[in-house]
């Protein structure tokens, strides 16, 4: 089994998380190599087609104006991608490794906490992978037969049918139950899927680490839209979800 072989070869005994925790997350988050064209996708949830009001009149200027968006059905991962999942892809695709990934595709900080091409930071295998450029994230998705979600897809999945600021019923006092942020993270990245999921079954949609989406950044339009993908060109790509 590739997971077991990589674990024995690349992680010293004291670095590996408990077998129970690893197996639980493997089942929950779908630590797999290729979803292909299966009808059921381990570690993913199906988001039904729908229409929602995207943005927030109470948020930052970049979140305005609120506008109506329609989105087709799509699948999205339940969990943020871990160092361990990323390692599996690096083992098969040297192009994405720290020493070989072209400099033009990142800012110089790519996988800066990894000790080597196939050695993540100590005790980080079940934590979300960080210091990943948009291009690296897109290549990773392509290698395993997936793609980056659009910003609209991310938001409808995060909202879970809600219309308020958070993806759950209740105010900011409930936020520590759903995510890691400045006040409760201890200034550290945490193992994925340790908090309560949203109604769609997605974990860490609030905090822990930022998540890349497909779109170039642009100001929102008042116009209604269907399956928006953002502008064709831009200066910055969009991240969603927040971090600590």
What is each of the regions a protein language model found here?
Residues 12-15, 19-21, 26, 128, ...:
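Disulfide-stabilized, aromatic/cysteine-rich ligand-recognition loop
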Residues 46, 130-131, 147-149, 165, ...:
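Structural recognition of the beta-strand scaffold that forms the well-ordered cores
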Residues 43-53:
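Mature N-terminal segment immediately following signal peptide/propeptide cleavage
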Residues 3, 12, 51, 56, ...:
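Active-site microenvironments of metalloenzymes and redox enzymes
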Residues 123-126, 179-206, 230-233:
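Short, well-ordered junction/capping motifs at the entry into regular secondary structure
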Residues 2-39:
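Pro/Ala/Gly-rich low-complexity, hydrophilic intrinsically disordered segments
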Residues 54-73, 189-195:
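Short, polar loop/linker segments at the starts of domains and inter-domain junctions
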Residues 61-69, 162-163, 185-188, 205-244:
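Surface-exposed recognition segments
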């Amino acid at each position: 089994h590739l997971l077991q072989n990589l674990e024995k070869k690349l992680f010293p005994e004291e670095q590996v998380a408990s077998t129970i925790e690893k197996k639980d997350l493997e089942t929950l988050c779908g630590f797999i190599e290729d979803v292909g064209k299966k009808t059921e996708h381990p570690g993913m949830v199906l988001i039904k087609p729908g229409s929602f009001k995207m943005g927030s009149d109470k948020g930052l200027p970049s979140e305005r104006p609120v506008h109506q968006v329609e989105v087709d059905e799509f699948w999205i991962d339940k969990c943020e991608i871990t160092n361990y999942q990323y390692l599996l892809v690096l083992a098969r695709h040297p192009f994405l490794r720290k020493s070989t990934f072209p400099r033009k595709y990142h800012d110089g900080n790519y996988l800066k906490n990894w000790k080597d091409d196939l050695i993540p930071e100590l005790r980080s295998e079940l934590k979300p992978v960080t210091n990943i450029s948009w291009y690296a994230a897109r290549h990773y998705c392509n290698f395993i037969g997936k793609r980056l979600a659009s910003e609209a897809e991310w938001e409808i999945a995060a909202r879970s049918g809600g219309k308020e600021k958070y993806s759950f019923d209740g105010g900011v006092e409930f936020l520590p139950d759903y995510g890691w942020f400045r006040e409760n993270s201890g200034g550290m990245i945490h193992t994925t899927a340790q908090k309560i999921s949203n109604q769609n079954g997605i974990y860490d949609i609030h905090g822990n680490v930022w998540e890349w989406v497909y779109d170039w950044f642009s100001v929102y339009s008042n116009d209604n839209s269907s399956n928006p993908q953002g502008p064709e060109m831009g200066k910055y790509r969009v991240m969603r979800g927040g971090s600590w």
